[in-house]
């Protein structure tokens, strides 16, 4: 739902207020009829004292609460009456105060124009210093008053909405009170409380009605106060600067006098040493003069930075007040845009830290030299002894005078250096405060502007005002055009333009040579002996250089147009540099996908895919150019983004083109390109979905009025696209380098094998006992393993780099999310060490919780693949261990993610543990078997008596363990059927694990031979059959035994061992077949029970054998 915000005319506002007030008064008739006199505070306090003497009970507590509430309401009435009287007084004196403020403003403007420092020059330095201190105090008072005036002015901007809300709330409250007063059963004390409450509401209604009625007058009054204080602040700052300049000039004059005095003394001296000392004093005086000038410069910088700091502090207060008063309105958006433009930039003075360190060292050294001059006799004696000179009394006196002057000059120098040090430290701290406050203001403005509507929603009203808005924008664009008025720099600019054309032409002249070099590289990469890892980087560099000529020509033409046809060429020049950079990138990018370009020759893609990508990129360039130049339209009007209807139309058209034309083509290209690379399918899916949904979402934002938000996101998406393109190019270049290295390694190994084979052939032709043939050495690592390990290592850094790049691109919007902390969803009490506090759960907490749940879901779904790539593929683990680790980590991630998400929403473990305890007890009785199976599953995962892949037998069911779940274990029996067995059966029942600690099992083959057979031969044949089977272990070795005399057989057993359970069936089959073959070859009969059937004739006694005739 879109709510239109508009300013209600004062007439209708006052009419609405009068109606609300009349309604509230009419509904208060019952209260007026009940009594005409309200109780006094003294009478209520007396009643309260009498009530406290009553016996304890509910009636006493209720009566005390009613009386105390009545007393509080009376006090609120008194406070409200004072507020009403103050408002009335302000209104009655508003006209005179406005005239007075305007007159004072005119006087201050005249004072500002005619300000002079002549009078200050005649004052002493102490007097000027005291005046400066007083002015600084006055400046602080003016800043505080200005803050108050600004708060009043900002609050007046939203007085209509706040007064209407208060009147509406009072009407509802009045209706509720009147309904209570209509009930005759309420007590007299409660009735008096309601009557007092009605009186308070009446005063509040009167106050709000007065505010609405005199809204314009109060706005004029507060604006005049603000203008006066603001101008007064400027005058005071100007006076401070003027006085500080006079102080600096006096300091400078004093230093100059000392220099002149030293120079005068030099003219009358004949002694060489004294002349040298005079020269040193003159140099010291000159140095003192330089340091005084530096101190004066630092003073001006410190004063300027302090004024900026005060201005920023005032701006911060103003922004906070405006945000509080105009939350969610279009007016706030326009104010934010204005404040952004007013923020200072590039104000910091560089090198202050080094200057402070140098000053401290310098002060220390000069102080040491000055301390030597306190004992002049000792200093002169030292000079006489070192230089071998003897001063006369007059010369000694003159030297003392010089040293005394030097000591004074040194003290002045130290004072100046200390002043510089203090100013530099103060300036550095001020700069730090300016940076912090500026960053805070910038962050707050970014937060507000991102989440606040910047334009009117696109609806029917927007369509109606579209023609007029378009005309205004086109007129604004025409105002930007014009011929230059100053041609002083024209010769230099022409030389600059000519230089760009010449460089571009030189590159264009070598175009054929560059193409020949590229063709040469393309031919070399198809041969193993000429291919190199540097072939692709060199080809990329040549391609970028080849596309540079058109970029330079484009830049030259754009800057010429900006100079000759725009009133402010600098704005157009900034745009031309930016567009030239994009031009170079996209011409380079599109040249990679030529039929014989790098994408085909170096990255081994098909020409059809290259052509498809080229077509998509050409269309993307159109969209990017349209979106990048949207800001041009917003700069031609005074309102900026607020009235940028042309930019809105342009942006929506570009996004529609992206969603309707580019997205389907891009998806088709990705589907055709996907078979060429079998990695990162999930990333391709995300890109495909994003290309469809992002333009639609941005269009919705623009339609709803969040035009600035959409432009901000568009800019970040474009930068992300460019960053991804560069990353993709680097990634494929590195991959190709690894491929080239792998091919060379394979070639070297093949050559080594051939050489080794040739040596072996030579050895075979040499018959000598001294020659020992050495077999081929085993390869340490397969080529595929080398390449896969390199790719995994590179992927780790490449994907980390991509995440870092994306964070850099989107980092400025991270602070925007903190705005969600101000949107409270619910509140709850929390007990801490400091006591019970109220904790607010905001929309930011909900967003963080959703992110945690999403990350947890992604980890749980992909933990098996991640562990396989990072750990399991590099470490040899026993059977079932990877499954156990994966399952346990899944449970851990779910528990941590769930607990973290709940804690983010204010539901900590201390609050949930009792719920979980109660649920555990309740569910433990109701779902005992399920809990038993759950605990049994945890035991099985930790003790690991069975593992995935083990062959087990339980309850006469045999099969292979396929899954170990929370409740049950899935077995795959030998008929390929899934058997679900509860976990509890494996813990409490008897289980046979055929491969728990050792997969070796024994096979027993029973054979019965006929009586009379050669038993030794039978034993040999059984062992021979066992030895011939490769799956039978030699340790323990096979054994054959003659066990029993059967009814018709001599029973033997062949006992062998196999390494794996899966070899049992195949080994049994092979042994039985081989034993049958060997016994048949050696005429050994396998005895069996034989039944002969005879048909007997009872009459004749003849017996006829029954023979089965096979047909």
Swiss-Prot record:
Keywords: Cell membrane, Membrane, Signal, Transmembrane, Transmembrane helix. GO terms for cellular component: plasma membrane. InterPro entries: LSM_dom_sf (IPR010920), MS_channel_1st (IPR049142), MS_channel_C (IPR049278), MscS-like_channel (IPR052702), MscS_beta-dom_sf (IPR023408), MscS_channel_2nd (IPR006685), MscS_channel_C_sf (IPR011066), MscS_channel_CS (IPR006686). The chain crosses the membrane at residues 490-510, 538-558, 572-592, 620-640, 644-664, 694-714, 797-817, 840-860, 885-905, 922-942, 1003-1023. Gene3D superfamilies: 1.10.287.1260, 2.30.30.60, 3.30.70.100. One of its GO terms (biological process) is intracellular water homeostasis. One of its GO terms (molecular function) is mechanosensitive monoatomic ion channel activity. It is a multi-pass membrane protein. It is found in: Cell membrane. The keyword Membrane applies. Residues 1-31 form the signal peptide. Pfam families: MS_channel_1st, MS_channel_2nd, MS_channel_3rd, MscS_porin, MscS_TM. Belongs to the MscS (TC 1.A.23) family. This is Uncharacterized MscS family protein HI_0195.1. It comes from Haemophilus influenzae (strain ATCC 51907 / DSM 11121 / KW20 / Rd). The lineage of its organism: Bacteria, Pseudomonadati, Pseudomonadota, Gammaproteobacteria, Pasteurellales.
């Amino acid at each position: 739902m879109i709510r239109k915000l508009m300013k209600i005319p004062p007439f209708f506002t006052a009419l609405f207020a009068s109606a609300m007030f009349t309604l509230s008064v009419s509904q208060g008739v019952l209260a007026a009829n009940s009594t005409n006199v309200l109780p006094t505070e003294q009478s209520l306090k007396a009643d309260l004292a009498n009530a406290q003497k009553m016996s304890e009970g509910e009636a006493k507590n209720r009566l005390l609460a009613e009386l105390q509430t009545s007393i509080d309401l009376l006090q609120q009435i008194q406070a409200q009456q004072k507020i009403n009287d103050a408002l009335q007084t302000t209104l009655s004196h508003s006209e005179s105060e406005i005239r007075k403020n305007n007159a004072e403003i005119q006087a201050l403007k005249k004072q500002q124009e005619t300000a002079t420092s002549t009078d200050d020059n005649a004052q002493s330095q102490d007097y000027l210093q005291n005046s400066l201190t007083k002015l600084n105090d006055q400046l602080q008072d003016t800043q505080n008053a200005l803050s108050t005036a600004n708060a009043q002015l900002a609050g007046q901007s939203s007085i209509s909405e706040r007064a209407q809300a208060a009147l509406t709330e009072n009407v509802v409250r009045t209706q509720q009170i009147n309904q209570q007063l209509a009930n005759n059963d309420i007590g007299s004390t409660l009735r008096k409380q309601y009557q007092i409450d009605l009186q308070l509401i009446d005063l509040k209604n009167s106050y709000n009605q007065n505010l609405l009625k005199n809204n314009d007058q109060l706005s004029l009054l507060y604006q005049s106060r603000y203008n006066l204080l603001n101008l007064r602040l400027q005058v005071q700052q100007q006076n401070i600067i003027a006085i500080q300049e006079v102080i600096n000039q006096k300091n400078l004059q004093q230093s100059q006098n000392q220099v002149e005095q030293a120079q005068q003394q030099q003219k009358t001296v004949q002694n060489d040493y004294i002349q040298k000392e005079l020269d040193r004093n003159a140099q010291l005086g000159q140095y003192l003069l330089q340091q005084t000038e530096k101190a004066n410069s630092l003073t001006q910088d410190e004063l300027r930075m302090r004024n900026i700091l005060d201005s920023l502090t005032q701006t911060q207060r103003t922004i906070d007040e405006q945000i509080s008063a105009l939350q969610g309105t279009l007016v706030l958006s326009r104010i934010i845009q204005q404040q952004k433009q007013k923020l200072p930039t590039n104000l910091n003075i560089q090198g202050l830290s080094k200057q402070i360190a140098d000053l401290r060292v310098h002060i220390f050294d000069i102080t040491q030299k000055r301390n030597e001059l306190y004992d002049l006799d000792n200093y002169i004696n030292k000079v006489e002894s070192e230089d071998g000179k003897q001063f006369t009394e007059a010369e000694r006196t003159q030297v003392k005078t010089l040293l005394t002057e030097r000591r004074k000059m040194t003290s002045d120098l130290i004072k100046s250096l200390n002043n510089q040090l203090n100013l530099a430290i103060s300036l550095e701290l001020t700069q730090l405060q300016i940076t912090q406050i500026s960053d805070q203001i910038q962050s707050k403005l970014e937060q507000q502007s991102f989440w606040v509507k910047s334009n009117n929603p696109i609806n029917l009203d927007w369509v109606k005002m579209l023609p007029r808005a378009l005309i205004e924008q086109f007129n604004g664009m025409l105002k930007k055009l014009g011929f230059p008025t100053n041609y002083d720099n024209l010769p230099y600019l022409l030389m600059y333009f000519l230089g760009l054309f010449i460089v571009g032409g030189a590159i264009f002249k070598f175009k054929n040579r560059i193409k020949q070099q590229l063709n040469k590289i393309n031919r070399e990469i198809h041969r193993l002996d000429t291919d190199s890892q540097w072939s692709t980087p060199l080809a990329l560099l040549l391609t970028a250089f080849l596309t540079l000529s058109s970029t330079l020509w484009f830049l030259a033409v754009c800057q010429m147009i900006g100079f000759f046809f725009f009133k402010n060429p600098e704005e157009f020049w900034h745009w031309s540099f930016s567009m030239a950079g994009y031009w170079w990138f996209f011409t380079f990018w599109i040249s990679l996908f030529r039929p014989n370009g790098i994408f085909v020759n170096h990255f081994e893609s098909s020409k059809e895919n290259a052509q498809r990508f080229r077509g998509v990129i050409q269309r993307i360039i159109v969209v990017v150019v349209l979106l990048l130049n949207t800001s041009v339209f917003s700069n031609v009007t005074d309102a900026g983004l607020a009235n940028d209807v042309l930019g809105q139309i342009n942006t929506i058209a570009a996004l529609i083109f992206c969603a309707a034309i580019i997205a389907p083509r891009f998806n088709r290209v990705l589907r055709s390109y996907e078979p060429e690379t079998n990695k990162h399918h999930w990333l391709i899916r995300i890109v495909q979905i994003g290309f469809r949904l992002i333009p639609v979402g941005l269009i919705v934002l623009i339609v709803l009025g969040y035009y600035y938000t959409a432009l901000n996101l568009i800019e970040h998406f474009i930068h992300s696209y460019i960053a991804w393109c560069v990353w993709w190019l680097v990634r494929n270049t590195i991959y190709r380098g690894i491929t080239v290295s792998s091919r060379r390694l394979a070639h070297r190994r093949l050559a080594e094998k051939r050489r080794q084979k040739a040596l072996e052939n030579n050895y075979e032709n040499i018959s000598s006992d001294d020659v020992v043939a050495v077999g081929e050495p085993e390869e340490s690592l397969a080529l595929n393993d080398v390449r896969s390990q390199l790719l995994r290592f590179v992927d780790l850094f490449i994907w980390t780099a991509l995440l870092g790049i994306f964070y850099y691109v989107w980092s400025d919007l991270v602070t925007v999310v903190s705005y969600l902390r101000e949107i409270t969803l619910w509140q709850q009490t929390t007990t801490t060490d400091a006591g019970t506090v109220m904790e607010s759960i905001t929309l930011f907490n909900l967003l963080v919780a959703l992110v945690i749940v999403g990350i947890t879901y992604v980890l749980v779904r992909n933990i098996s693949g991640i562990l396989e790539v990072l750990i399991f593929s590099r470490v040899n683990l026993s059977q079932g261990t990877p499954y156990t680790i994966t399952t346990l980590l899944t449970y851990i991630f779910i528990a941590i993610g769930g607990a973290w998400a709940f804690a983010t929403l204010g539901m900590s473990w201390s609050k949930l543990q009792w719920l979980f305890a109660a649920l555990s007890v309740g569910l433990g009785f109701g779902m005992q078997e399920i809990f038993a199976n759950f605990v049994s599953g945890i035991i099985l995962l930790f003790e690991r008596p069975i593992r995935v892949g083990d062959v087990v037998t339980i309850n006469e069911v045999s099969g292979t363990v396929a899954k170990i779940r929370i409740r049950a274990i899935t077995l795959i029996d030998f008929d390929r059927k899934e058997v679900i067995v509860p976990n509890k059966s494996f813990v409490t029942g008897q289980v046979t694990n055929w491969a728990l600690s050792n997969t070796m099992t024994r096979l027993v083959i029973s054979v019965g031979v006929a009586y009379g057979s050669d038993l030794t031969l039978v034993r040999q044949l059984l062992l021979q059959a066992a030895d011939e089977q490769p799956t039978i272990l030699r340790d323990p070795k096979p054994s054959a035994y003659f066990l029993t005399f059967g009814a018709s057989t001599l029973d033997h057993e062949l006992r062998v061992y196999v390494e794996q359970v899966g070899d049992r069936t195949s080994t049994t089959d092979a042994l039985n077949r081989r034993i049958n073959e060997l016994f048949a070859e050696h005429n050994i009969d396998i005895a069996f029970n034989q039944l002969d059937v005879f048909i007997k004739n009872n009459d004749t006694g003849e017996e006829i054998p029954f023979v089965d005739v096979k047909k």
